[in-house]
């Protein structure tokens, strides 16, 4: 007989404004504890020193995580010019310096090469796997890694401010798998002056915004209370980028069993991904074909 998972069957999203100095996994564990939830996960890792939106999926909402990780995200960050570090952020040992400082115009011109479809090499200290091991574990042991470049879509990358000659504040909107530390490193190299991330904040991720997130202090304060539970957003929030199709009663019953079910289509095209609802509740995600949704994920709500 299978072991029953302990905790409450809560499904939805809790948006956290992650503080610096805390790992994304630690935030998820705190949320799970505070809500006594059976299951939780996050939609996109933030570095420990980074702040901003961390969307925590609970229960059946974990099935919608891929739609958030695939969505566009926005980052604001400060690049420290003139210094290169082992980790490409302020926590690492300085390994190279330069007295050169680019002008605002030179920075603006260099940013053009980092927009659109680019190839990006992850930082040495990253969660990328190398022959089954995490890159950061190998890097800590002193190994210099030859990491392969990966494609990244950069929707926009703009200068927000130039506080002084040593710093430039940028804002980037990008797709899945982007490393802001790599942008800072590569920009510094392109400008001939080195660079690393001084600080980093994710301001939004898909439909979730940092300004709507709650602090870890609030989670501690409201732990195990109905007040915290009331802050959990509906599961459907994670499906905001997909069209919704109302299911017929018979269609909903079939979808819940994993079978194609009849839906009421509007302007959804054949072969398009969508999600079905019945009486206001998400039922399944799948592919629309000829009046039916063919489910790929079914929600047990």
From Swiss-Prot:
One of its GO terms (molecular function) is tRNA pseudouridine(55) synthase activity. The active site is at 47 (nucleophile). It holds the Pfam family TruB_C_2. One of its GO terms (biological process) is mRNA pseudouridine synthesis. Its EC number is 5.4.99.25. It comes from the Bacteria. Keywords: Isomerase, tRNA processing. It catalyses: uridine(55) in tRNA = pseudouridine(55) in tRNA. Belongs to the pseudouridine synthase TruB family. Type 1 subfamily. NCBIfam families: TruB. Responsible for synthesis of pseudouridine from uracil-55 in the psi GC loop of transfer RNAs. This is tRNA pseudouridine synthase B. The gene is truB.
């Amino acid at each position: 007989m299978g072991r029953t998972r302990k905790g409450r069957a809560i499904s939805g999203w809790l948006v956290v404004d992650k503080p610096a100095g805390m790992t994304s996994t630690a935030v998820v564990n705190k949320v799970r504890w505070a809500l006594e939830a059976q299951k939780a996960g996050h939609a996109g890792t933030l570095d420990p020193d980074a702040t901003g939106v961390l969307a925590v999926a609970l229960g059946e909402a974990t099935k919608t995580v891929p739609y958030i990780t695939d969505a566009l995200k926005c980052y604001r960050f400060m690049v420290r010019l003139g210094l290169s570090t082992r980790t490409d952020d302020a926590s690492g040992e300085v390994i190279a310096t330069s007295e050169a400082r680019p002008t605002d115009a030179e920075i603006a011109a260099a940013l053009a090469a980092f927009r659109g479809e680019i190839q990006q090499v992850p930082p040495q200290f990253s969660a990328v796997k190398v022959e089954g091991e995490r890159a950061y574990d190998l890097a800590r042991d002193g190994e210099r890694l030859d990491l392969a470049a990966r494609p990244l879509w950069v929707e926009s990358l703009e200068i927000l401010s130039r506080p002084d000659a040593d710093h430039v504040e940028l804002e980037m909107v990008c797709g899945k798998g982007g490393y802001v530390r790599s942008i800072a490193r590569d920009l510094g190299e392109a400008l001939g002056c080195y660079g690393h991330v001084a600080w980093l904040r994710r301001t939004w991720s898909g439909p979730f915004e940092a300004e709507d997130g709650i602090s870890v202090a609030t989670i501690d304060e409201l732990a195990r209370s109905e007040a915290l539970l009331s802050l959990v957003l509906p599961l459907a929030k994670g499906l905001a980028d997909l069209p919704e199709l109302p299911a017929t009663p018979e269609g909903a019953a079939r979808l819940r069993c994993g079978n194609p079910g009849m839906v009421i289509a509007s302007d959804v095209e054949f072969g398009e991904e969508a999600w079905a609802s019945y009486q206001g509740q998400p039922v399944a995600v799948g592919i629309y074909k000829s009046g039916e949704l063919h489910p790929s994920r079914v929600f047990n709500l």
